[in-house]
Structure formats: structure tokens, C-alpha cells
Regions:
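Non-catalytic interaction-recognition regions
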Residues: 1, 6-405
Length: 405
């Protein structure tokens, strides 16, 4: 993992600017409002049709490079098209206890940052960064125009393949419902309280830290647990799992072009299109197998028993069970489609479909009420397929499955 620092752009700027000038991709304006500026002429270009004043200033008349100009240099480096590399050193990660570490928060990948000189650099890090097969910039949709400029600049600099490998993962903004904003301590006007959602704004001083959001979610999850199980001792690890699941599903269930108005109560609901609903389904499947084993009955199928399910008579595999199999069978296709379109919401919708299949299976095909061993085995197999599918999809979404809800 690499921190983006000024050093990267400082070293890359002269080379990228020379490439753009040599290719005729930027011109020095001598008159008009952009006199003295280096400008990328975009008027009439296909991606910018219909735009007024589409031309983009890359370097101002006082020699200052604009953000977009820096992003062009950074993009060319990420694509490996600058023909240079930098010196790197491990960057300290400071844990919540204030102790400096050289391990990332996930306990695996070291963090690196660039250096201006070789002294103290890690030679093994050279060549590890930049030159990606694809470069995916995760930036909100309001930056679509600058990102189009960056892509066009890469193309005009003489790297059409690099432009094709440049992807803007655009997403709409994340806002808060008025009730959630006030819950987090944001002071709202009467006008703001009447809105569908409240935008975060640095200019207005409206902002929420991610840590505060998660902390409040954990508190609300504990309240949910105590409401459902009065007298229960609060289980922090379970509340954290529910809170993280609620947040991740809520943030990914919408398509990228939809504004997300985050609401605590809706996110933590145990019914509907929510993380707790999916976690509950996963926990219940595990509970069913555990109860079967407690009764001395077969639980999870082993490989040999699972292989024998396909040989069962069709009478034991009715339409209800086949519907479950078909739903779960679309998992790989859904993964591929989500990766191809960068639409994570497809995974959430699939997980919800599997969750609905579980609830249908639970109510219409109870294992203990099966007529015989063959029918019971078919129902166990369908339930096991649901359990593994939920585990796979929730795992990709980063949604933890607690031991109990």
C-alpha cells in the first residue's frame, strides 16, 4: 500500500508536462481570460460535447499547477507510462493506542511512502507500485469532468492504451437523514430538518468522522440487542459485528448513481434490505444444523453424502428446493457481473435473494418434518448450499457473521 504524497507529483510533473507539450496536448494561451496559462483544448472533443468552456487549465499564469494537472502526472505514473520510479520507505502506522507500528491495520500489508532520496529507502519496494493493468480512481461523481480530462490527457500524451485502462469509479455522495445527523451532534436549521437528507459540507462546518459513525452504530446495536433480549449482558463483539454489517450493506445496497442518505434505524433493522437481516439468516442456518446434531440427527453433509444428493429421486427435489438451488447457483455469475460493471449493489441484491430463499425454505421445507431420510437429506443439502452462499457473498462484502444475534 502506498500513501499518495506530494513527492510523487513533484518528481512526475516535469516529465508529464514535457510529454503533453511534445504531443501538442497543451498550449500556452496568449490572450483572453486564460492568458499566460497552459491549457488543454477540449472544445469539440467527443467526451466534452455540449459543454460550455470545456477547456481545462493545467498550469496557471503564475506557474502553479492545478489539481487536474497534478492528477494527470499521478495517473501517468500509476499507469507506468512515465518511465521512472521513486524511492520508498515503510511508513509508520499508528495504532489506536498511539504506538507506532510498521504493519497495516489489517495485520498484513506494510504501508509505504515515497522519499526524495535513496538514503533510508527500502530497495525491495522499487517496482512494486505503478504500472497497473487497470487504474481505478474511486472519486465521487462530482469529479467526473476532471477525471474525463485526466483520461483524455493520457490519450493525447501518446498512451491510448493507458487511457483505455483508466477507470473512474464514480459514486454519488453519502449524506445523512436529518434525524441521523442530529444523533451525531450536527446542529441543523429548521430548513435542514425538512430536507430528505443533509449533505456534509466543509464550508458549512457539517461533517462527521467515520469513527464517530461506527461508534454510534455500535451503541445503537447494543440497544437493539437489549430490546430483543432484556437482561442480556451487552456483548461488544456481537454489537460491533452487527454495526459493521449494517454499515457495509447500507453503503453498498444502492447503485453508484444514487445518493445514499444514511439512517441509523433503517440500517440496523432486522427486517428488510439490511445487514442484520442477512446476518440473521446466516446465523439461523448455523443454528439449525447445530440443533440437528444436538438431537442426534445428521447435520452438515460430508462430501460423499453431498455427492449422493444428485442421485435422489425427483420426488425429493421439488420445485421449492430447485428454486433455492437456482438462486444460489447464480453466485459466480453475479460476482463476475459485479466485477465487470463495478456495481457492488449486485452482490447485495443477490445476498438478499438468497436470504429470502432461506426464509422460504425454513417455512415450507422444515428438515425435522421431512417424510423420510432421502427427503431430509435433500433439505439439508439445500440449507447447506444457502449457508455457504451467504458466507461467500457476505465475506466478499466484508460483512461479519456473529455467532448469535
Amino acid at each position: 500500500r502506498l500513501f499518495r504524497v506530494t513527492g510523487v507529483q513533484t518528481c512526475a510533473l516535469p516529465i508529464s508536462f514535457d510529454l503533453l507539450k511534445a504531443a501538442g496536448a497543451t498550449q500556452l494561451e496568449t490572450e483572453g481570460k486564460n492568458a499566460g496559462c497552459w491549457v488543454m483544448k477540449l472544445e469539440g472533443a467527443k467526451e466534452f460535447e455540449g459543454m460550455e468552456d470545456a477547456d481545462k487549465v493545467l498550469v496557471r499564469s503564475n506557474g502553479t499547477v492545478t489539481y487536474t494537472g497534478k492528477d494527470v502526472a499521478y495517473q501517468l505514473w500509476k499507469l507506468g507510462d512515465l518511465g521512472i520510479d521513486f524511492e520508498y520507505e515503510k511508513a509508520p502506522y499508528v495504532n489506536p493506542f498511539g504506538e507506532a507500528e510498521f504493519i497495516a491495520s489489517d495485520g498484513t500489508s506494510p504501508l509505504y511512502r515515497t522519499r526524495h532520496d535513496a538514503e533510508g529507502a527500502d530497495p525491495s519496494a522499487r517496482g512494486r507500485f505503478g504500472g497497473g493493468d487497470s487504474v481505478i480512481n474511486v472519486i465521487d461523481v462530482r469529479q467526473s469532468y476532471p477525471q474525463k480530462v485526466v483520461k483524455e490527457a493520457v490519450r493525447r500524451a501518446g498512451f491510448p492504451e493507458g487511457a483505455d485502462r483508466s477507470v473512474h469509479f464514480a459514486y454519488e455522495m453519502v449524506a445523512l437523514t436529518p434525524a441521523s445527523a442530529e444523533l451525531l451532534g450536527v446542529t441543523l436549521s429548521d430548513e435542514d430538518r425538512g430536507r430528505a437528507y443533509v449533505e456534509m459540507s466543509g464550508r458549512k462546518g457539517l461533517g462527521v468522522k467515520a469513527d464517530d459513525l461506527v461508534e454510534r452504530l455500535v451503541e445503537k446495536a447494543i440497544e437493539q440487542i437489549l430490546d430483543r433480549q432484556p437482561g442480556e449482558r451487552p456483548d461488544l463483539s456481537r454489537a460491533e459485528a452487527i454495526a459493521i454489517g449494517a454499515l457495509r450493506v447500507y453503503m453498498t445496497r444502492y447503485s453508484r448513481n444514487k445518493v445514499i442518505a444514511f439512517d441509523f434505524d433503517e440500517a440496523l433493522a432486522f427486517e428488510g434490505d439490511t445487514g442484520p437481516y442477512l446476518q440473521y439468516a446466516a446465523v439461523r442456518t448455523a443454528n439449525i444444523f447445530r440443533k440437528l446434531e444436538e438431537k442426534g440427527l445428521p447435520g452438515l453433509l460430508d462430501a460423499e453424502e453431498a455427492a449422493s444428493v444428485g442421485a435422489l429421486d425427483a420426488a425429493h427435489l421439488d420445485d421449492g428446493l430447485w428454486d433455492v438451488v437456482r438462486t444460489c447457483g447464480r453466485t459466480q455469475e453475479t460476482f463476475e457481473k459485479a466485477a465487470e460493471t463495478f456495481e457492488v449493489s449486485l452482490l447485495v441484491r443477490h445476498a438478499l435473494a438468497v436470504g429470502a430463499a432461506f426464509h422460504h425454505l425454513y417455512h415450507t421445507h422444515p428438515i425435522l418434518q421431512a417424510e423420510n431420510d432421502e427427503s431430509r437429506r435433500a433439505r439439508r443439502a439445500a440449507l447447506q448450499l444457502v449457508a455457504r452462499t451467504l458466507e461467500d457473498v457476505l465475506g466478499v462484502l466484508g460483512v461479519p457473521i456473529p455467532e448469535r444475534m
